[in-house]
Amino acid sequence: MANETQKVGAIHFPFPFTPYSIQEDFMAELYRVLEAGKIGIFESPTGTGKSLSLICGALSWLRDFEQKKREEEARLLETGTGPLHDEKDESLCLSSSCEGAAGTPRPAGEPAWVTQFVQKKEERDLVDRLKAEQARRKQREERLQQLQHRVQLKYAAKRLRQEEEERENLLRLSREMLETGPEAERLEQLESGEEELVLAEYESDEEKKVASRVDEDEDDLEEEHITKIYYCSRTHSQLAQFVHEVKKSPFGKDVRLVSLGSRQNLCVNEDVKSLGSVQLINDRCVDMQRSRHEKKKGAEEEKPKRRRQEKQAACPFYNHEQMGLLRDEALAEVKDMEQLLALGKEARACPYYGSRLAIPAAQLVVLPYQMLLHAATRQAAGIRLQDQVVIIDEAHNLIDTITGMHSVEVSGSQLCQAHSQLLQYVERYGKRLKAKNLMYLKQILYLLEKFVAVLGGNIKQNPNTQSLSQTGTELKTINDFLFQSQIDNINLFKVQRYCEKSMISRKLFGFTERYGAVFSSREQPKLAGFQQFLQSLQPRTTEALAAPADESQASTLRPASPLMHIQGFLAALTTANQDGRVILSRQGSLSQSTLKFLLLNPAVHFAQVVKECRAVVIAGGTMQPVSDFRQQLLACAGVEAERVVEFSCGHVIPPDNILPLVICSGISNQPLEFTFQKRELPQMMDEVGRILCNLCGVVPGGVVCFFPSYEYLRQVHAHWEKGGLLGRLAARKKIFQEPKSAHQVEQVLLAYSRCIQACGQERGQVTGALLLSVVGGKMSEGINFSDNLGRCVVMVGMPFPNIRSAELQEKMAYLDQTLSPRPGTPREGSGGEPVHEGRQPVHRQGHQAPEGFCQRSAPGPAICPAPCPGQAAGLDPSPCGGQSYLWPRHCCCAEVSPGEVGLFLMGNHTTAWRRALPLSCPLETVFVVGVVCGDPVTKVKPRRRVWSPECCQDPGTGVSSRRRKWGNPE
């Protein structure tokens, strides 16, 4: 259908077809939020075209914003002077170009001529800035139109070259000093390629101030960042689907879009990509950039040059001229990550760095959560949020994502292994290291020793054979942990900065990679014990290569130094005392014991985003309870309540086309209670299997069944296999199980889809497929099981967290202490058992955390075509003391038995499913949902005209159904 322009109020929204009314409301509210610079929480259910509404609404605002900015600039440039603030366009003043130029209050009693002079000067300065900005924009647009191949940012290469020259001078000086001493023989041994493993001289504190000023001067040479929109989502597949939606939108041909990703996703160097581990890929990439300058530096020294090239070659794809070409190509036409990767291979340019070069001139930047929410990653990628717009999609798990991203866990074996490696490194190169390097290395060794001691172990013994006298879990504040570990006198900020600047973890990995198997035979006997200990912790390469090539085991193929991981724990210990806790988990042996930093206040990492950005939009299909975002994330980040705007809309599916059904008891009248105490009972697992057998017998196509956890799915699967229920299920549906490995998900889904298609054509005894999945896993979001792929979705129990978990209890206590209690009524959209203080019930915020976590983890339903009447099969009506309402308010539901579900599916519409409960069902009655779509081929007759799956368009209304094929995120 041709693109249409919808006018909502005075705003024109280009749209590829006639939008729903809720989409018009969505775009209008989004426009107002961006214009006013507020924080918006948008809730739009699955299947309502949320992505397209975000695209058209946000890009319409950006179009109008740039137009107003050009008009204002033209007016000021034409008159030469003018009011610096316009009432209508006050928000327009406009970008950083108008910062501080106007509205500066003058001291009272100042002469009028002084005030007039200052005002005129400010106006002239503003006009000069506008002229410069206009010239820069014109130059940028010309470059994009003509695709000129210019090499920019040469200062980066110059800077790296200077660093390498300094390092070479230091190494040459060290060799001259030692070549006549007792270490001369050993020095000759080091010249066979070990120079790259030696730490360069480290400067800190005042010594770094001069270098920082140089860095600031170089930063001025970077290209200016225009006003843009940063769109982020959880997975790369969701980002790819969003880019495809942008291509199909009316803005697809004009918008300048760039997709960002990790080195693991964008690397085109097969030698580097084959390393597998993300950390190893990152480190090798940086090392290869540095080695390209060593190659040039050693041109006149033939032998050293050959030795360095044999060890590590420069990356042929890191070429500024080719990356500039890739940048221009990426901005000239919308490309997803796969197209960017193909372009990089064709142009022999690095897509990772080429896409980063495109950020300043891009209007829409698409990136994963981690690159936006992690400050260090954001800074390294060159992302600047000042006065920009950020849209966070699929944000229902935003709080948990930030918490998990900044929580770090290290094991006793990792601590011992890092200590052993670092001690051998110091023994090997200690004579060549400067005093400041040795000081910091000894501090790191001391920290590792104390971390092991606080767990109750001995750093000098093998952690696999050490048994701890005390076991259990202990939780401490950060300060208490530092005092107990006796490391409160060490400046962790300096240690963290040293680890980052000196790249000690990278040097240490290179050292262990080189000498992991042969070092002990070449050293003195006193080091043989350390090397033997290291080998006992780290398997040989041949043994690792024989392991299965699973993603979960990818890191074991080429293990990175554990110091890389421990650096994250050291950085976490610099968090404010009240914002985190340290959990000491002492198990049977030291190797299994762990130290974990638990972030309690995710707002400290989100505060910088909301403070710098012009506007932030948090969107998702199910954002309830919204109060969690308001209180735990925004209020704690310093956002005023008046700045937060909420928007929520219903579904486009008519209520008579979707009907959730809750199964409270099984075939043998066994009550379904999937609590931690009862869900592992054999009769409970048997009852679930019998219910699924009956459902699979009458439901055509695909059935998707979600379990609360991988462990419970494993237990149920093993029990069914032992009791024969798995064979009964396999006779009706081919069974697929969600893999734990991410790279196997596509293979499983493809086989699942092909099986259903084949069964639909053959019409044999096997009528489809059954997919066993896990809530919060790789199938729970971002994938649409449309048409026959999702005829029935069943939820077994609810993914409540373990209430006895020390982490959860500490989070609950933190919320109780931090968030002010609200007497009387509970928060909207969440529950929690009231705690009575005197005669007044008080709903504790912490007691509501388990239900909020459960609600955010539950998967969204599979949305079926509007004319197909849908039903839901849910298991487990387990009672709960709270009064939460977890059910979507636009759905209706009924409590039925498995027999009634079967009768309905076979065409009997007079069963108890018509006893619909209120639209908001209390938690005691409704726990679980799954959608069963009636097959148009069977006796279930649709109440409206059937839509064509090919065009996905209602012939009666001409409105798109917003459904996408399997494999694409919503």
Curated annotation (Swiss-Prot):
Residue ranges, annotated region (Disordered): 289-312, 818-849
A Pfam family matched in the record: Helicase_C_2
Binding-site list for ATP: S44, P45, T46, G47, T48, G49, K50, S51
EC supergroup of this enzyme: isomerase
Chief place of localization: nucleus
Keyword field contains Lyase: no
Bias-annotated ranges (Basic and acidic residues): 289-304
Localization of this protein: Nucleus; Nucleus, Nucleolus; Cytoplasm, Cytoskeleton, Spindle pole; Midbody
Regulation: ATPase activity is stimulated by high magnesium salt levels (up to a 0.1 M), and potassium salts (glutamate, chloride or acetate) are more effective than the corresponding sodium salts. ATPase activity is enhanced by the long non-coding RNA (lncRNA) cohesion regulator noncoding RNA (CONCR). Double-stranded DNA helicase activity is maximal with magnesium ions at low concentrations (0.5-1 mM) whereas is markedly inhibited at higher levels (5 mM and above).
Enzyme Commission number, as recorded: 5.6.2.3
Gene Ontology annotations of biological process type: cellular response to bleomycin; cellular response to cisplatin; cellular response to hydroxyurea; DNA damage response; DNA repair; establishment of sister chromatid cohesion; negative regulation of protein binding; nucleolar chromatin organization
One cellular component term from this protein's GO annotations in UniProt: nucleolus
All residue ranges annotated as the Helicase ATP-binding domain in the record: 9-445
Chain location of the short sequence motif DEAH box per the record: 393-396
PANTHER family (UniProt xref): ATP-DEPENDENT DNA HELICASE DDX11-RELATED, DNA REPAIR DEAD HELICASE RAD3/XP-D SUBFAMILY MEMBER
Illness association: Warsaw breakage syndrome: A syndrome characterized by severe microcephaly, pre- and postnatal growth retardation, facial dysmorphism and abnormal skin pigmentation. Additional features include high arched palate, coloboma of the right optic disk, deafness, ventricular septal defect, toes and fingers abnormalities. At cellular level, drug-induced chromosomal breakage, a feature of Fanconi anemia, and sister chromatid cohesion defects, a feature of Roberts syndrome, coexist.
Protein name: ATP-dependent DNA helicase DDX11
Organism listed in the record: Homo sapiens (Human)
Gene: DDX11
